[in-house]
Curated annotation (Swiss-Prot), chain A:
Matches recorded under PROSITE patterns: GLUTAREDOXIN_2
Disulfide pairings: C21-C24
Keywords assigned: Cytoplasm, Disulfide bond, Electron transport, Redox-active center, Transport
Encoding gene per record: GRXC12
Gene3D superfamilies: Glutaredoxin (3.40.30.10)
Gene Ontology BP, a term: negative regulation of transcription by RNA polymerase II
Annotated CDD domains: GRX_GRXh_1_2_like
Family statement drawn from the similarity comment of this UniProt entry: Belongs to the glutaredoxin family. CC-type subfamily.
Organism: Arabidopsis thaliana (Mouse-ear cress)
Source superkingdom: Eukaryota
SUPFAM superfamilies: Thioredoxin-like
Keyword Transport: yes
A GO-annotated cellular component: cytoplasm
Name recorded for this polypeptide: Putative glutaredoxin-C12
Purpose of the protein: Has a glutathione-disulfide oxidoreductase activity in the presence of NADPH and glutathione reductase. Reduces low molecular weight disulfides and proteins.
UniProtKB/Swiss-Prot annotation, chain B:
Listed GO CC annotations: nucleus
Species per Swiss-Prot/TrEMBL record: Arabidopsis thaliana (Mouse-ear cress)
Region (Disordered): 53-83
Listed InterPro entries: bZIP, bZIP_sf, TGA_domain
Role, per record: Transcriptional activator that binds specifically to the DNA sequence 5'-TGACG-3'. Recognizes ocs elements like the as-1 motif of the cauliflower mosaic virus 35S promoter. Binding to the as-1-like cis elements mediate auxin- and salicylic acid-inducible transcription. May be involved in the induction of the systemic acquired resistance (SAR) via its interaction with NPR1. Could also bind to the Hex-motif (5'-TGACGTGG-3') another cis-acting element found in plant histone promoters.
Positions of the UniProt region annotated as Basic motif: 84-104
Domain bZIP: start-end pairs: 82-145
Name the UniProt record assigns to this protein: Transcription factor TGA1
Disulfide bonds: C260-C266
Ranges for region Leucine-zipper: 110-124
Gene Ontology biological process terms in this record: defense response to bacterium; DNA-templated transcription
Sections of the chain in a coiled coil: 83-131, 261-281
Domain DOG1 intervals: 153-363
GO molecular function, one term: sequence-specific DNA binding
Length: 103, 368
């Protein structure tokens, strides 16, 4: 859990993914399109991956555990939440507020 | 269970070829009628005719005379009664005339049957779209040909048929009230109902995707012109915005800006989902082609591909979620009256696509 928090606040935008997860790929692509360059942590490549996956599920209710998106160190949500925030424009505002993008 | 299932596939699959069989059969009966025609009589009156000739009742001209018995009769009698030649010739002419009339009537009858068949085919198509094939309670689909008998899909097709009917009704209602006078509270409840109706479709699709995601993705439940625009089991929200934008009432500058931003957001989200789908296709192809191709045993490959495919359902749901959120956001941007006009325009756009599909489907079948 500590490790999730540490990694999540390391950068303005952080996404926990798995290398095999295609929806994660979509969410990453969306962030790149918005001009952000999020830190990507692939849980299936990390020795502590399973622990972090459990933490994401338990603490943030992220189900499925990935993708799990953090902006400005705060949990934004899963793919569904990210799309909602993107459509109503608030994702962009969050990214601006935490200096993940400037425009 | 398998015997029932194999039983059940042919009606739908072979449906396309059935007309060919029909025509084949008619062709044969046509041939046999032609051969009857050379005798100038339909089957059922051959015998009385022959009897009459045997009895030398030659005044009878109502039936044909060109068949073999007639010929025999004619040759036998000419030497004795030369004037009979004229009578025979007249009878032959008469018989030939009648034969031509019968042939004409027969061809006309064939033509009518052809039109009837086309009509039946169209009805069958329509019924199929409304999901009138019988579900038989088989719940396994391990052999992959089961989308026709999956009860979840059968229920979805039925529900979708009702859904379209209800949508048509709502469009009519919106059209009527927008032409008349209606207060904003009533209009808002109509608009909210129409929105809920779309959300209901997303809910239906989500449970259908659980039953058979390939069926939902294929768009088989939609008409062909609608399928042409298919993107992950439905329409691209950005396409719809593009189509609808000129049909809204006058928008304020702020509204225009909001709608443009929304369109851009939609496009970005669509691109992102499309790229995820592409990755899914790549990994699936890699999965299926893993190991040595051609060695004959591929159960592990198929199993691991099955696991990958699970992700497909989440893409259909996510795409519908994007559609859902886009509708909501439009409603936030627009006034109630503008939203009502927008929903009317959207509904009529779908109606026109459905009309286009059926016109296109019947274009070659018009009698020339």
């Amino acid at each position: 859990m500590e490790r999730v928090r540490d990694l999540a606040s390391e950068k303005a935008a952080v996404i926990f993914t798995k290398s095999s997860c295609c929806m994660c790929h979509s969410i990453k692509t969306l962030f790149y399109e918005l001009g952000a360059s999020p830190a990507i942590h692939e849980l299936d490549k990390d020795p502590q991956g399973p622990d972090m996956e459990r933490a994401l599920f338990r603490v943030f209710g992220s189900n499925p555990a990935v993708p799990a998106v953090f902006v400005g160190g705060r949990y934004v949500g899963s793919a569904k939440d990210v799309i909602s925030f993107h459509v109503d424009g608030s994702l962009k505002q969050m990214l601006k507020a935490s200096n993940a993008i400037w425009l | 269970m398998n015997s029932t299932s194999t039983h059940f596939v042919p009606p739908r699959r072979v449906g396309i070829y059935e007309p060919v069989h029909q025509f084949g059969m008619w062709g044969e009966s046509f041939k046999s009628n032609i051969s009857n025609g050379t005798m100038n009589t339909p089957n059922h009156i051959i015998i009385p005719n022959n009897q009459k000739l045997d009895n030398n009742v030659s005044e009878d001209t109502s039936h044909g005379t060109a068949g073999t018995p007639h010929m025999f009769d004619q040759e036998a009698s000419t030497s004795r009664h030369p004037d009979k030649i004229q009578r025979r010739l007249a009878q032959n002419r008469e018989a030939a005339r009648k034969s031509r009339l019968r042939k004409k009537a027969y061809v006309q009858q064939l033509e009518t049957s052809r039109l009837k068949l086309i009509q039946l085919e169209q009805e069958l198509d329509r019924a199929r779209q409304q999901g009138f094939y019988v579900g038989n309670g088989i719940d396994t689909n391990s052999l992959g040909f089961s989308e026709t008998m999956n009860p979840g899909i059968a229920a979805f097709e039925m529900e979708y048929g009702h859904w379209v009917e209800e949508q048509n009704r709502q469009i009519c209602e919106l059209r009527t009230v927008l032409h008349g006078h209606i207060n904003d509270i009533e209009l808002r409840s109509l608009v909210e109902n129409a929105m809920k109706h779309y959300f209901e479709l997303f809910r239906m699709k989500s449970s259908a995707a659980k039953a058979d995601v390939f069926f939902v993705m294929s768009g088989m439940w939609r008409t062909s012109a609608e399928r042409f625009f298919l993107w992950i089991g439905g329409f691209r929200p950005s396409d719809l915005l593009k189509v609808l934008l000129p049909h809204f009432d006058v928008l304020t500058d702020q509204q225009l800006l909001d709608v443009c931003n929304l369109k851009q957001s939609c496009q970005q989200a669509e691109d992102a989902l499309t790229q995820g789908m592409e990755k899914l296709q790549h990994t699936l192809a890699d999965c299926v082609a893993a190991g040595q191709l051609g060695e004959g045993s591929y159960i592990p490959q198929v199993n691991s591909a099955m696991d990958r495919l699970e992700a497909l359902v989440s893409f259909v749901n996510q795409a519908d979620h994007l559609r859902h959120e886009t509708l909501q956001q439009m409603y936030r941007i627009l006034t109630t009256r503008q939203a009502a006009r927008g929903l009317l325009a959207l509904g009529e756009y779908f109606q026109r696509l459905r009309a286009l599909s059926s016109s296109w489907a019947t274009r070659h079948r018009e009698p020339t």
